[in-house]
């Protein structure tokens, strides 16, 4: 829905403020995700985590029809409470269930399913709003479609298999301890929070959260309703392609060593994302003076503004896949993965809450774009060192495999002797 630009609303300030509240509550419940999962399991946590989304969409629908704002805030609070649990457990499932050499593609599959919902929603929105070549809000039927789709989340979540019932293709079982007391869980979370891996990834996750307020506000400020609907659809399409590109770069053996693939993928993402944010600041500086209204009917002006938005979505998906691939290779099981996922997604949602709060003031978009660019360059060295940690773990695993192979050869020689 945010792919429509501030949820398809005419008022960026209202939805940005509501999203700030939503993500503030999500920050709390993200950190509580491992505790709830220990009690009721992955399946029920995922299903219950989806119940707030249709309430959020219903609030926007009510505002669209009546102009009332209270339901928007109510829906944001309810969505924030439930979605934090959803976010923490979905990340653990995507990073902890697959084998190490498949994790990039499994993460891409996870984001593809999420983008598939955006593609469906974007298609519906584009079909309903394709004639509205002015700025404003999307039609109310758009929200009805979103509410119907989101209500299916609870049902489909119950089809998930808990980790202890999953067997990987290589025959290994997944360890996911249950019944851990809350004091022990809190102790493990505190220990992980102070670890080098979390500290190195924190700047990148804060950046990743902070930037999410900007693209939708940019879209709502400068583009017509039908162009925003097109943006919602196309952002899901390019996001899916980008996350698969990142997943294949780290998984497909185009280079023999996974260490080489990790470093090369990081460099590729760093270069593309750096260029995108420099371009975004340049375009935004121009638009603060010209204040255009962009529509695909005027392709010469539309293409530049829409192009930078597309690249922001492309690089967002590249970074998203890569950071979760890092998590998946720093943790060894869904039990560990849900702690990594909860902590880092909690940091991400805190960044999102602050980002939307700042944008709701409102803040000049040139300032927001410049801060986004600065945060990216600030997070780069930390992200590189996090990549180095993953490479070191790969080296350790290789040494362990070589030692086991050598031990097996010695055993064979002894038996023959």
What are these regions (language model features)?
Residues 4, 160, 167, 172-341, ...:
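Membrane-interfacial loop- and helix-cap regions that link adjacent transmembrane helices
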Residues 3-14, 60-70, 95-102, 118-143, ...:
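Extracellular/lumenal inter-transmembrane loop segments of multi-pass membrane transporters
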Residues 166-182, 392-417:
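Intrinsically disordered, low-complexity terminal tails of fungal membrane proteins
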Residues 28-70:
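Conserved MFS/SLC helix-loop-helix module at the cytosolic interface between two early adjacent transmembrane helices
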Residues 19, 25-27, 79-86, 101-153, ...:
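Glycine-rich segments within core transmembrane alpha-helices of 12-TM secondary carriers
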Residues 13, 44-60, 260-280:
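Structural signature of the two symmetry-related core transmembrane helices
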Residues 111-114, 139-160, 267-274, 368-389:
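Symmetry-related core transmembrane helices of the 12-TM Major Facilitator Superfamily/SLC fold
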Residues 78-90, 99-102, 311-323:
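Core transmembrane helices of Major Facilitator Superfamily
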